[in-house]
């Protein structure tokens, strides 16, 4: 429910076109205006504010900002952002809010709240005329399931924004290379969806009768684990789950490990990979139901070796969606089915 999800056929139709892909003028202009506004302000901290899958998507921004710069950055779920009223929130803050529909009440209110504090506010949404976008000073809207190239969709737009922002906060030539190589994103998404299609189907076939599936990850990928757990397994498939941080696994959660307890482990490619490997080694000893998505095995064709760590998180959402599709296919439970969401007041 968070990453850009093109169907396999739609993606494969674009593979091998071999021409330089550029973002649409409208989208490029939106990002340029935001970056210009950032340059004019004395930004001292950054808040990423949203709910659910949108919050998970924004969390990659916080990961890269905190990893690459000394600018404090935070992730908040929208309602807590309002109720906690962070002391650091002021006219020197950048607040990025996101809602796919643009009408998530808590996030709309969070945008208004941040703007009232004098913060520079940026809204990200599918719909430019949504309530959320109307509350923020600046907007970024992305294309979705309309056969657009991925550079104009949510992942491409957000990563372009984040690396343009990094270039302002802590200039580095590698960010320019990331921005240039994002033109490969569409093709890489297609290739990795195809690469993991069999594994995803086998996952669905093997675990279709499981009532609980734990996910585990660290670094940037804990946000993918959270999204897969909350949005795909719990919300869409009604499978009990919990996203366990690999670094926290041995501080309590590992006691639930048993031969019949399923784990989906995301083996990351960043500095925290040793945490994932340690946890994986343990669950493999005691559980017969361990599946691994090894980020180092993704197809990174066209990406510089030293930039792969930045692209892994951009590709993993589409890969994990393949695993969810496998479960949906073999359980006969469509990902679109809801019991409560959008059907009643809550």
Predicted features by range, described:
Residues 2, 6-45, 146, 163-245, ...:
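Active-site phosphate/pyrophosphate-binding segments
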Residues 183, 291-295, 313, 323, ...:
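Aromatic-enriched
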């Amino acid at each position: 429910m968070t990453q850009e999800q093109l169907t396999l056929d739609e993606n494969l139709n674009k593979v091998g076109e071999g021409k330089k892909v550029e973002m649409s003028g409208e989208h490029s202009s939106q990002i340029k205006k935001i970056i210009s506004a950032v340059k004019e302000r004395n930004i001292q901290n950054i808040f990423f504010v949203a709910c659910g899958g949108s919050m998970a998507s924004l969390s990659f921004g916080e990961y890269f900002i905190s990893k690459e710069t000394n600018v404090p950055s935070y992730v908040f779920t929208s309602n807590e952002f309002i109720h906690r009223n962070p002391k650091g929130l002021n006219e020197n803050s950048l607040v990025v809010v996101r809602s796919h529909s643009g009408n998530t009440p808590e996030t709309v209110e969070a945008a208004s709240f941040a703007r009232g504090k004098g913060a520079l506010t940026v809204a990200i949404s599918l719909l430019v005329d949504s309530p959320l976008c109307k509350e923020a000073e600046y907007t970024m809207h992305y294309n979705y399931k309309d056969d657009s190239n991925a550079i104009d969709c949510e992942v491409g737009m957000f990563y372009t924004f984040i690396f343009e922002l990094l270039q302002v906060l802590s200039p580095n030539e590698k960010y320019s290379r990331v921005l240039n190589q994002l033109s490969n994103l569409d093709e890489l998404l297609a290739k990795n969806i195809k690469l993991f299609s069999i594994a995803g189907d086998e996952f669905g076939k093997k675990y279709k009768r499981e009532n609980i599936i734990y996910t585990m990850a660290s670094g940037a990928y804990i946000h993918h684990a959270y999204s897969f757990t909350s949005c795909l397994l719990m919300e869409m498939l009604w499978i009990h789950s919990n996203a366990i941080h690999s670094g926290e696994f041995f501080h309590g959660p590992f006691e639930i490990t048993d031969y019949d307890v399923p784990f989906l482990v995301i083996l990351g490619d960043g500095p925290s990979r040793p945490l994932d490997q340690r946890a994986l080694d343990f669950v493999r000893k005691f559980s017969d139901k361990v599946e691994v998505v090894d980020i180092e095995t993704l197809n990174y064709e066209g990406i510089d070796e030293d930039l792969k760590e930045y692209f892994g998180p951009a590709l993993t959402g589409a890969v994990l969606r393949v695993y969810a599709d496998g479960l949906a296919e073999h359980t006969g439970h469509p990902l679109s089915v809801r019991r409560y969401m959008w059907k009643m007041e809550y």
